[in-house]
Amino acid sequence: MIKKIYKKYEIIFNVVLFSIFPIAAFYLMEFYEHNPFEEVRFMAAFFNIILFELIAWILYFVTGRAKWALRTVFIVAMVFGLINHYVMLFRSTPFVPWDIFSIGTATSVASNYDFAPTAGVVVVTVIFIALIMLMHFVDFRIKWKFRFRLIPTVLGILALCLFVNALQDEDFQTDNYLYPFLFTPAYMTKVNGMAVTFAMDLKFVAVDKPDGYSRQKAKELLDSYSGTDDNSDVANNTAITDKSDYPNIIVVMDEAFSDLSVLGDFDTNTDYMPFVHSLEKGNENTITGYLNTSVCGGNTADTEFEFLTGNTMAFLPVGSIPYQQYIKSTTPSLASYLKSIGYATYAQHPYYGSGWNRDTVYPLLGFDNLSFMQDYSNQRFVRKYISDETSFDRIIETYENKPDGQPAFIFNVTMQNHGGYTDTYYGFDNTVTADKLNNSALDQYLSLIKMTDEDLKKLIEYFSNVDEKTIVVFFGDHQPNDTVASSVLAANGMDYNNLSNEELKLRYQVPYVIWANYDIDEAAGKDTSVNYLAANVLKAAGVPTNDYQSFLLKLQEEYPIISAVRTDKTTDKTLDKASNKSDKAIGSKNKQADSDMLNDYKLLQYYRLFDWEDK
């Protein structure tokens, strides 16, 4: 009887059975990171299921066998869920489409992270594997030849493409309560689900031209800022007119260097950065403040990109890596500009040159002399990475061997403080402990920061005794990941998983120092963002700025901070904080002019990054 009923309704039974598995795959994948029944919005969950169903049925028509189609869906979902979980753990942001370009870099540093699975990860993975094995019994097939299966396959692919296109439509997102804001990617993934968010993000793999853009318009706009920089103003007596008197410019972008006290108070057994703290109190020929970054816990290359080019990640997809996605030919930068006015240009990084494509990108940015791990002599290691002491010795060695009479621009990116911070290492002991926080990762991190602080002091002491004018710039690329910062946040009443917008901004601040061995204007507590820093360095150094840098200095007067996380606007000498959707919140009588400046920035950035004449 049962067999007869099954035979009669076999197709319906198989369709229902087949359709249940993609739903299970979606919810299991989400459980790697959170409880989707509580946090994924209803319509978003429905759309995730549609994506899974479409992919499963396409695979069924391609393979002709249910078990292989379903196994493929489950394996992909399991791998995707695991990747997203560990990316969130180590970087505090979800896996996005352009992370695929970063696989090589991620692999090169993976050994220094703790991949020990939590109980939840183990349970979800076991369920995945059990269901994959159970699919051995779900083995109904399509008996059609492939040429007959081709039509439903093509129709399925077309339906999938149309549906993904709908998910990327702003009106569709609004009508169906999908969260659209890329500048909070973790929350976006949490409430939309991984698959829907990934599909929405695909729209931003390529960067569209800004409204009203033309190369001629951008060139004319850039020309309008020719000769407008402070250092070319007759009233400014700090400008250096003799090129032979240009100072050496040494820039250290230090891996994960930050002062976590910006998140709130916590006590330690000793000061973890006494030298930097002393400079921040006010020091001769020194400028200090906080630098607002676009990244946290990773994606170092984005901070490099913003500093060297003056461009901002605010106008690019969140999580994108310009070094890997956009810089494919000659691109104007601080290095190419300084080279054009007579500087010798050096880029140094004590790790693999292939990381973030640096060995390819640096020459395109104008660096003539490259040094990577194999070029460092007398290597000393801290944990698994070449020490900052070794890295700073390389700077001194480069300075001492540069051509006589030619100023040097040395850009040095360190590795010593790279995460993770949970393993123990022979020969490395924590010298700093945070009282009552019971976080060994935090203790290790602070101990590393103290070592860097000591090495920075030695570097500045060296250049304080050289005859040539030299300016040293030091800043961190980003704060460490949540494993380190969570206990500091918790001690100050904050949950790292549920930070308010104002609290989130604190996670994107690092200290910076501009120091010179000759007279420059001093300042303390001067906050800025990475895109402005190079122009500010040239202004402080007395080196003339080019047209784009002059524009940035002017823009900075109205928008002192622009990053992927925040855009702060000055109105009547006060600072209005807003998100990077801030055009709607300005509300001043100068709104149109201010918006025009931001639009000009978008035009100029697109021109210099994607439409430069030398490309």
Give the ranges of each region predicted by the language model.
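Transmembrane and membrane-interface helices of multi-pass
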Residues: 1-188
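Short hydrophobic/aromatic segments of transmembrane alpha-helices and their interfaces
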Residues: 51, 71, 241-242, 463
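N-terminal post-signal-peptidase region of extra-cytosolic proteins
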Residues: 116-117, 225, 327
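Membrane-interface segments at or immediately adjacent to transmembrane helices
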Residues: 165-251
